[in-house]
UniProtKB/Swiss-Prot annotation:
It comes from Mus musculus. GO terms for molecular function: small GTPase binding; zinc ion binding. SUPFAM superfamilies: Cysteine-rich domain (SSF57889), Ubiquitin-like (SSF54236). Potential tumor suppressor. Required for death receptor-dependent apoptosis. Mediates activation of Mediates activation of STK3/MST2 and STK4/MST1 during Fas-induced apoptosis by preventing their dephosphorylation. When associated with MOAP1, promotes BAX conformational change and translocation to mitochondrial membranes in response to TNF and TNFSF10 stimulation. Isoform A interacts with CDC20, an activator of the anaphase-promoting complex, APC, resulting in the inhibition of APC activity and mitotic progression. The modification N-acetylserine is found at residue 2. Residues 2-115 are annotated as: Mediates interaction with E4F1. InterPro entries: C1-like_sf, PE/DAG-bd, RA_dom, RASSF1-6, RASSF1_RA, SARAH_dom, Ubiquitin-like_domsf. The modification Phosphoserine is found at residue 2. This is Ras association domain-containing protein 1. Residues 175-196 are annotated as: Disordered. Residues 290-337 form the SARAH domain. Keywords: Acetylation, Cell cycle, Cytoplasm, Cytoskeleton, Metal-binding, Microtubule, Nucleus, Phosphoprotein, Tumor suppressor, Zinc, Zinc-finger.
Length: 340
C-alpha cells in the first residue's frame, strides 16, 4: 500500500445508496487467494480448496457464509468452520469451497498486548452532549495536537467534519464481484460502488495491514462507516457480517468494545483526542454470537422460522428412530431369552 493515506469522503447516505437486507443472492465463481504484491500465474496447476480442516461451528456462531453469502441459521447444525483459517460456510457449501486455506493469520498486532486483551460487551458508551462553545474548543484543542493536515472543521449548523482511521483486521475472506482478473487494492481504489446486477462473486483475503482514512460528519453512524468501507473495496458480503470496534490501550492491556450501529465514531474521536492509544477504530468480523433480529426483513425472518421448523422435525425424527431401534433390540433380546 502507498504511504499516502487514501481518503474516503463519506457525507450523507441517500436512501437508495443504503444496503438493504434483501439483496440478490450471488453465485460463487472461482475463488482465489490474492497475496499482496504478487500475481497468479495462469499456467500453474492449482488444486482448489486445499488445507482446510472443517469442523462443526460452535452453538453461538451466528454469521454469514463465506461462500454463498447467506446467513447461517440453525440450532443443531450451525455450519462448518475451518480450524485453521476460520473460513465459515454452510454444510451444503463445503464441497464448493475453492479458496485454499491460508492457515492461522498473523495480523501483526502486539502479541504481548493481545494476550491480555479484554473484549467488552457491545454496550453503547455514554457520551456527553457538548455545547457549541465546548465543541468549538474541543476542535481547536484537537487540531493543535495533530501533526498532519487531517483537521476537524466546525460547520455553521453546529455539526463538524473530520477524519477517522480504520484498520481492517479481518481473519476470514471477503467476496467481490467476479471479473476476468482478481481485484487488487489498486483496482478497489479506482473502482466505484457495488453493482446490483452482479451474478457471480470471487473470494480473497484482504492484506493484514489495510488501513483507510474516512472523511465523515459528526452524525455519521458506525453502520454507515462499515458500508462505506465495503463499497470502497467492492465487497459484496452483507454489512452485518462485520462490526466496528474501538480499541484502547490502558495499563499495558488492550480493550476492544464493539460499537453499536448508531454510535458516531467522529464524536468518539473528538472526545478521546488524536492519540491512537487512547482510541483507534478496527473493522472485524461480527462474531460476538449476538443477532440483531430487527435488522432482518420480514421474508428473511419467515424463512428462518421455516428452517427452524424443518430442523426441529428432522431432529425429532432422528430421536424417535433412535428409541425405536433401542426398543426393537430389547424386544429381540427378550424373545431370545429362554423361558423359566
Amino acid at each position: 500500500m502507498s504511504a499516502e493515506p487514501e481518503l474516503i469522503e463519506l457525507r450523507e447516505l441517500a436512501p437508495s445508496g443504503r444496503i438493504g437486507p434483501g439483496r440478490t443472492r450471488l453465485e460463487r465463481a472461482n475463488a482465489l487467494r490474492i497475496a499482496p504484491g504478487t500475481t497468479r500465474n495462469p499456467s500453474q496447476q492449482h488444486v482448489p480448496g486445499r488445507g482446510h480442516r472443517f469442523q462443526p461451528a460452535g452453538p453461538t456462531t451466528h454469521t454469514w457464509c463465506d461462500l454463498c453469502g447467506d446467513f447461517i441459521w440453525g440450532v443443531v447444525r450451525k455450519g462448518l468452520q475451518c480450524a485453521h483459517c476460520k473460513f465459515t460456510c454452510h454444510y451444503r457449501c463445503r464441497a464448493l469451497v475453492c479458496l485454499d486455506c491460508c492457515g492461522p493469520r498473523d495480523l501483526g498486532w502486539d502479541s504481548a498486548l493481545e494476550r491480555d486483551t479484554n473484549v467488552d460487551e457491545a454496550v453503547e458508551r455514554e457520551t456527553p452532549d457538548l455545547s457549541q462553545a465546548e465543541t468549538e474548543q474541543k476542535i481547536k484543542d484537537y487540531n493543535g495536537q495533530i501533526n498532519s493536515n487531517l483537521f476537524m472543521s466546525l460547520n455553521k449548523d453546529g455539526s463538524y467534519t473530520g477524519f477517522i482511521k480504520v484498520q481492517l483486521k479481518l481473519v476470514r475472506p471477503v467476496s467481490v464481484p467476479s471479473s476476468k482478473k482478481p481485484p487488487s487494492l489498486q483496482d478497489a481504489r479506482r473502482g466505484t460502488g457495488r453493482s446490483t446486477a452482479v451474478k457471480r462473486r470471487t473470494s480473497f483475503y484482504l492484506p493484514k495491514d489495510a488501513i483507510k482514512h474516512l472523511h465523515v460528519l459528526s452524525r455519521t453512524r458506525a453502520r454507515e462507516v462499515i458500508e462505506a468501507l465495503l463499497r470502497k473495496f467492492m465487497v459484496v458480503d452483507d454489512p452485518r457480517k462485520f462490526a466496528l470496534f474501538e480499541r484502547t490501550e490502558r495499563h499495558g492491556q488492550v480493550y476492544l468494545r464493539k460499537l453499536s450501529d448508531d454510535e458516531q465514531p467522529l464524536k468518539l474521536r473528538l472526545l478521546a483526542g488524536p492519540s491512537e492509544k487512547a482510541l483507534s477504530f478496527v473493522l472485524k468480523e461480527n462474531d460476538s454470537g449476538e443477532v440483531n433480529w430487527d435488522a432482518f426483513s420480514m421474508p428473511e425472518l419467515h424463512n428462518f422460522l421455516r428452517i427452524l421448523q424443518r430442523e426441529e422435525e428432522e431432529h425429532l425424527r432422528q430421536i424417535l428412530q433412535k428409541y425405536s431401534r433401542c426398543r426393537q433390540k430389547i424386544q429381540e433380546a427378550l424373545h431370545a431369552c429362554p423361558l423359566g
